[in-house]
Amino acid sequence: MKVTFMGAGSTVFAKNVLGDIMLTPALRECDIALYDIDPERLEESYLMVTALNRNINENRASVSKYLGVEERKDALRGADFVINAIQVGLYDPCTIIDFEVPKKYGLRQTIADSNGIGGIFRALRTIPVLKDFTDDMKEVCPNAYFLNYTNPMAQLAGWLGRYSGVKSVGLCHSVQTCSRGLLDKLDIKYSEPIRERIAGINHMGWLLEIEDADGTDLYPEIRKRAIEVLESGVTDHNDLVRFEYIRRFGYYCTESSEHNAEYNNFFIKAKYPELIERYNIPLDEYPRRCVEQIKNWKNEKDNYIHDKVSHERTKEYASYIIEAIVTDNPYKIGGNVINRGLIPNLPNDACVEVACLVNKCGIQPCRQEPLPLQLAAMNNLMINVQLLTIEAAVTQKKDYIYQAAMLDPHTSSELSIDEIVRLCDDLIEAHGDYLPKYF
């Protein structure tokens, strides 16, 4: 069995995923191919993975590295699973562009990696690279599974599912941590195992039902305590946006408050600057994290490539998916797939995040009941933008970029239609060769 890791320069994440594989008995003797276009980061990851293989896996795995476009097909050749963790354009210059150009128009963001104007342009510069990857896969590993971790998830997994021609699923961390994280924040005691039902779209999947092992419905207490937090006037809590979702829409969603603050037209308002403090919204949070991670990596990288590096299996889905397919031991995940009727009141071509059963037959998404009307409406605001962004990437027509931005709730609530067009033109120019030519 061969696993190819695209974007292996993401050393910490590569450690988590590949370390998980090495700690899975059925997968320990696999071939691991590391691919990146940055020679220094690739070498650091190679040193880390080989040390990890030696320390926790008795060198059972075979580890090789491949640098640059010229070696990409060799990295993919014969792969059974391809794990994608690339970031096109990195923090500098592209994340800086995503934040600084909109700021000139008075448009502020928190994360900008999934939805909003930042998510649109992150998708537009990434989809062409995914097309190169999957075109190569169809030639040298046509039966491989493509496990995508790169954001913006809904746009990328949506494109993969409709246009790539390879088996794929989009994977995020938010589903696994949603319920227990919420209960811990509200200090609600519960008995394991929890039974939950989550469905929606990536970063806006809805916790529709939650019961503890005794069959107790936990939502009444969740709603009560979330509203108590909001009414207390506290401003240093990190989940006030999602608690407002509970109060106003009745349900909690999977991704963090800093993400969801920029997914709608409620919270980041030039006209109401006091909302930033009221909801503890961290503007420019993602650039701040990037700078901190770059700084920390310089201090910590020796710990990762040092001989003593070790690992404990994480909750990342990748190793569990591979194990379930290889061993036919079923496993349930929250996966991002094309809707095709899975959630009846969302568009057929939308990328939805639903429960999926994984076994030797592959990744099989499970049909859901219709979402509550208000939740489907919230999801559709995002889906409209995501579908138009994919259409822009496929057709290379600039009008679809404009239309996606015009329909984005946050962008359109702050800027005029003419400003949105000018902003898109400025972002296209600033991205330069990171984008294909649009007409």
Walk through the language-model features, giving the residues of each:
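Catalytic or ion-translocation cores adjacent to nucleophile or general acid/base/metal-coordination motifs
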Residues: 4, 31-33, 167-187, 194-197
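Short, surface-exposed basic-aromatic patches at helix termini and helix-loop junctions that form
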Residues: 23-26, 50-54, 139, 158-168, ...
